[in-house]
């Protein structure tokens, strides 16, 4: 039985005589201190010093005082908090206790008076009704006192008599080790509701959501985050307590790193304001146009920096606990309670996305460390290519050998191409004697599999005149990729074969949605929405994970990492997706074109994780299916608090421990009625369906659901399955027919698909728009960075391919900027946090920076050619302002690299490509976006090539591919080089006094050239040759600009020229 004390915030349990009793207090005399080794000693009154009144742990007074002042303030043995003894100095926690005046006398036992004192103590706790009625006890339930009394022995055996052999007839109260309890926490979170732990285990699952929400919230706040073991109920009770702990935690960056960083940011903001004030109030009269252009550019750069900087104010890391996830949902010997997950793989063109790459991704999914009956892999072939279909059939056969090999030897990664290409000691930690033999055999099997795939690829190079035919002689339905029916093929799963060990494999399903002329297909977003519907009809996983065809599972536990957040009752109900960072293979050593995007993934997204969560980056993301359906999140009052800067400066609105967390059952009803963001709630639909009393009302409800989700009763029924799985009323024989129906080209007509549900249409970068809509409804997202990267993919290392990729991203941002979903004006009545909105605004306006950036990069050349400058002669004070500005810029960069652990080279590559992309791809995106939105001139979607290098490592890096994107940066390079030559020539002709002003102009020009240096190397290529067409066009433009500027120099007065000409004559 458990009893409690409200005033002392602790519980005790009585032992019976079968337990090992604690030592009588009289035996403590002569004990050795268990910390320092000295004698325990006596008090001032000559009695044995007892540090802990609960267990009598031997501790001398010096160690006792040290532990209370500088230590944990708890007994090392029983973890009970030390009480203050008379004469001991007070510590902070003593202020909350009752005054202690006679602690020593209360336990002042000596050899001569034990008999006089112990009977009195025993009488106080005897089982007589007189004493029981006078001893009220308060229990704690959710932080509220509940009065109670110690029951009589015949009712509940409150006290177990343990007779001291030296004191016959006297009952001694034996206490368990005591833990200090937080009165605001539920007792269930400590595992101390019932002595019978077996009963608690049975009732645990019914109470887990309620308790975990309360407990995890306190855990993240650092209140009660450490849970001590009971030490008496055995390993089973400890296992139950461990299973109830949060499955993840927030790891804040050290304040020693963040505080200087924030101080420098504030100082930089102040210095920037002073600098801009100086620049705007000190024009250059003889170069007014150049000065005005430079000031406008600098003001925009300052605004752009603010948009980028503020969301990085409060970065965080996260840590997951896979062992707790297993204890809670996936115990050995019991059916797994992990949620079902549907994995989406999207591909379009097998010529640019090689089937072998897609096959490796699929194999890594099928071999993932997750219950096979909980995983389904859907491959979307939006190009309806028979090559993809046949390659997937070969992949399904090979997986029957590959999957058991991976699981038997627990290898990583589980994509065979990348596993066998690892240059590591593959025998490390592999103790099975059969491993080497089986690995060699598996490698031979994989080489044969590659040969079969390559034969299919070679065969697909020449398309037959009559189109492709299948093995049974029938025509391939997808011969016309723009006009074909929907196709679904289940390769593995319940209807497929078993692996070589006789075990079931995850489902593998091929899907190609229907396409017909006259229907808008919305590219990748439309294909993903088709996968949402077909997966809901066939498997209906509670969570969805999407990856590109070239992003394989590098960590077989990636899904479990995501489930640590998604299945956590405290945050899972309000988490729309878990985003993993993108990591890449096959990038050159120096990452010439910043393909790794390290600054974005390791700095920007960690900053957003401390606000409302990272943006969705298009791949490597695990979604909550309910969030994609447009439903409302389950929010608490904490989620509606001010933005993080206000919270950091002025504190939270919470008021200590007395704050009450809203009840879990009430959270689902939290909605904003005045929001212009469509918000749906599961309970609303339940009421719609169950609350009607007549068939007419039910018909109206059905029409509303069809208007939202489309005319598929099976799919609509699946949307109500919040935990996944198919409804019990579903007829398996009709599922494939219904699946074909939901991927038909006209299914989305007059529904909310692409508007409020699923992937959102309206931009080629559908990922940004989809994540923004979820955040606007109040959902949060999580950034998960496991120690072993979850996914790895390929990136375009060729300059032209890289620029085309950046062009597509920038074009999508411009489309969102000019749409109704623009974060500048959309969803202000929703639940999007201020700093999150600023981050989204920065995500869509960054291409506009290309215009001032282009102008700013041309300024050094014009200054050198015309012998003018954008800054007037400056005083010492102005010089100090400039030096402080540059110092603050570099100081903030260095401190940012320090807390993020990003390498300096990665940061510099990012800065260089910001200029390269800004003066090329971003500039083109602005004009293409304007033409597309206002003139209706659409641009073709270009799939980035994922083909691997066949001519050697990084051969693709040196291949030149012509694109008009190369012209603007090349022109900037040539103009600045011409300007440098002109400036030096002028200084040589003008004498020594002209070299001083020249230095500032040369530094300005070299700053531009240094940022464009990787671009210059890309132009030269392996043979150090630049294509003639690029040289001709760039030289022509540079010459035109230079001659035109010299001919109509606006900074030299016409009268001056005329006068000089006259005098020369």
Swiss-Prot record:
Coiled coil, from the record: 436-463
Pathway: Glycan metabolism; plant cellulose biosynthesis
Subcellular localization: Cell membrane
Cytoplasmic topology ranges: 1-257, 308-850, 898-912, 985-995, 1047-1065
Membrane topology: Multi-pass membrane protein
Cytoplasm recorded as keyword: no
Keyword entries, A-Z: Cell membrane, Cell wall biogenesis/degradation, Cellulose biosynthesis, Coiled coil, Glycoprotein, Glycosyltransferase, Manganese, Membrane, Metal-binding, Transferase, Transmembrane, Transmembrane helix, Zinc, Zinc-finger
Disulfide bond residue pairs: none
Binding site for Zn(2+) 1: 33, 36, 60, 63
Cofactor(s) this protein requires: Mn(2+); Zn(2+)
Transmembrane segments: 258-278, 287-307, 851-871, 877-897, 913-933, 964-984, 996-1016, 1026-1046
GO molecular function: cellulose synthase (UDP-forming) activity; cellulose synthase activity; zinc ion binding
Tissue distribution: Expressed in young plants, stems, flowers and inflorescences.
Sequence positions that bind Mn(2+): 524, 548
Catalytic reaction(s) noted: [(1->4)-beta-D-glucosyl](n) + UDP-alpha-D-glucose = [(1->4)-beta-D-glucosyl](n+1) + UDP + H(+)
Active-site residues per Swiss-Prot or TrEMBL entry: 382, 767
Cofactor binding note of this UniProt entry: Binds 2 Zn(2+) ions per subunit.
Annotated function: Probable catalytic subunit of cellulose synthase terminal complexes ('rosettes'), required for beta-1,4-glucan microfibril crystallization, a major mechanism of the cell wall formation.
Family: Belongs to the glycosyltransferase 2 family. Plant cellulose synthase subfamily.
Protein name, UniProt field: Probable cellulose synthase A catalytic subunit 10 [UDP-forming]
Lineage per the UniProt record: Eukaryota, Viridiplantae, Streptophyta, Embryophyta, Tracheophyta
